[in-house]
Amino acid sequence: AEYGAPVTAHEVFKPVTVTTAPDGETIYDFGQNFAGVIRISLQGSAGQVITVRHAEILNPDGTLNTTFLRSAKATATYTCRDGKQTYSPRFTYMGFRYAGIKGVKPEDVEVEAVALYSDVAHAGAFHCSNELLNRLQSNITWSAKSNFVDIPTDCPQRDERMGWTGDINVFAPTALYNFELSRFLEKWLRDVKAEQRPGGGIPNTVPVQGYGCLLYTSPSP
């Protein structure tokens, strides 16, 4: 079996608000930015097509703002069969707070979202009388969860989700106050070893060798 912390389903979010955008798309706000997938349940008709788009922020007019996704589509399309059914994307995940759905009326579908991240246990917690600091701690924790999906990434929403070595090098000391990361990081360091170049150089992303330049090259003997 593969060594490491498996990616599993965690928090389940219900929409905190449901609105209709000017173009008719139904916008669901889950109240938290996270990495995961949508889950819809409905009484569908054969051939009915439902499209779900994802975004972290909204435009002033209430539509999804996908500017920062670059070329990522962050879109799931589902074709229904007759009868009651539940759909959730497989073999992928998105970084989002908002989901826009077309192809089904909001009163005809149950919508929720599931956070996905590596199964790392909490190692510590922080709470104080200052709500701004509490929010900062919450943001730090959720940023870690969203970027601990099998490898340490720098963002969960864009058109690349690489294991940037510099980012985790900076963040690991902080993350270890919040999470037990031994299996997660040991597995990734095995990936780093596997990607190390003959001259000692380490790519700036692991485990995608050759993406970008070298981060570090050891001196020649």
Where are these regions (language model features)?
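Extracellular/oxidizing-compartment recognition motifs
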Residues: 1-158, 166-167, 181-188, 192, ...
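An alpha-helical repeat/solenoid feature that recognizes helix-turn-helix modules
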Residues: 164-170, 174-177, 214-215
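Generic alpha-helical structural context detector
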Residues: 173-176, 190, 194
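Conserved small/polar residues in nucleotide/adenosyl-binding loops
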Residues: 216-221
